[in-house]
A protein has these predicted regions:
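A short, N-terminal "cap"/entry segment at the start of jelly-roll beta-barrel domains
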Residues: 2-94, 191-266, 270
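A short beta-strand-loop-beta hairpin characteristic of the jelly-roll/cupin
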Residues: 105-142, 149-152, 157, 284-311
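Conserved GNAT-family N-acetyltransferase fold
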Residues: 102, 272, 315
Length: 353
């Protein structure tokens, strides 16, 4: 009994009449679907990005050197982009996400601007800097998760005596895909302060809301800082009261307390504690995910590759790649991905082994 030829065999068997037909229709900007169907509609995800890790101990010196070459004012944002090795030149760490290491020197200001891209910050190194969002400042402490929602005025400054470094995460590739990017510079490098520090957290993040406040699940949170001290205390309490999930350890998602949805409509953020000696069972999901080690050390087996990580190291797990985490000591990981978009579109999947 004859069996149908697979795509490779079909490609190797060139039909002269078909090839001539393809050349004729090419001038009309036409192409035959049957020649590319397997690529367009794969049986499983085939991400272009690859697993990768950036050791902070290796890249920190380059981040610091950038501070001697260009000012924050001239650069607008002094950032070294973490480019996926398979996506070089695209300013992308996954197909839909951007990540970079931003540094601000003592006395500098990264001037106020706004854009349609949503941004998150995870503070890694140094003290004394602040971020201002729509008229309110927050002092940046290591591990703090800070949001600048789409189209909000924001600037950064360093009032301390040491450089401060944080991880930037943005949905730049997603906005680029939709061709919806807008950007404006403010007339003032430093925006005026309209509210005292901590106002948004008190107003929207204390199990209370203004009596007439209403918000849709698709809108970003009014809270723009999630202090690491609170996150760490919650993880510690949770780990003391319940066994770790076999696949995830003690993993929590950041939420907009007014809606229970993701703080950002296009990116989800997560905090994860792994007990010392803990190894997760193999797990994979469709959202390519960027991880940052905040505490501890261990290894990440991503597909058939294994990466050792330490504090401030960044690693990326591509879509549908099996992940196993090993914690040498008690470890805290921060991560972010495009899961909210996939879930809203009904595309997200996970698989636990």
């Amino acid at each position: 009994m004859e069996t149908p030829m697979n795509m490779t065999e079909q490609a190797a068997t060139k039909d002269p009449a078909r090839e001539q037909f393809y050349r004729r229709i090419d001038q009309y900007n036409l192409t035959p679907l049957w020649e590319v169907l397997g690529t367009l509609v794969p049986n499983n995800p085939r991400p272009k990005q690859v697993p990768a890790l950036w050791r902070y101990a290796d890249v920190r010196e380059h981040v610091m050197e950038s501070g001697t070459l260009i000012t924050a004012e001239e650069a607008v944002r002094r950032v070294l982009i973490l480019e996926n090795p398979a996506l070089r030149g695209n300013s992308s760490i996954t197909q839909s996400l951007y990540a970079g290491l931003q540094m601000i020197m003592p006395g500098e200001v990264a001037p106020a601007h706004r854009h349609t891209q949503t941004a998150l910050r995870l503070v890694l190194d140094g003290e004394g800097a602040y971020t201002a969002v729509n008229g309110e400042r927050t002092t940046m402490h290591r591990g703090d998760f800070i949001i600048t929602p789409a189209w909000t005025w924001h600037d950064h400054g360093n009032l301390g005596d040491q450089p401060v470094v944080w991880l930037d995460g943005l949905d730049i590739p997603l906005v680029r895909f939709f061709d919806t990017g807008f950007h404006e510079h403010s007339d003032h490098a430093v925006q005026d302060t309209a509210r005292p520090e901590g106002d948004a957290l008190a107003r929207y993040g204390s199990n209370l809301l203004p009596v007439d406040f209403q918000q849709q699940a698709s809108e970003p949170t009014k809270i723009f800082v999630y202090p690491y001290a609170q996150t760490r205390a919650a993880l510690t309490a949770i780990a003391a009261g319940a066994p770790a999930d076999p696949h995830l350890g003690h993993k929590m998602r950041y939420v907009n307390p007014a809606t229970g949805a993701s703080p950002m409509p296009t990116m989800g953020a997560y905090a994860q504690l792994l007990p010392a000696g803990f190894q997760t069972a193999p797990y994979r999901c469709t959202d390519g995910t960027v991880y940052v080690c905040l505490e501890g050390a261990g290894s990440a087996q991503i597909g058939d590759q294994t990466f050792q990580f330490a504090p401030n190291d960044v690693f990326v797990v591509p879509s549908w790649h099996t992940l196993t985490l090993n914690a040498d000591s008690e470890t805290v990981l921060f991560s972010f991905s495009d899961r909210p978009v996939q879930q809203a579109l009904g595309m997200w999947r996970e698989e636990k082994h």
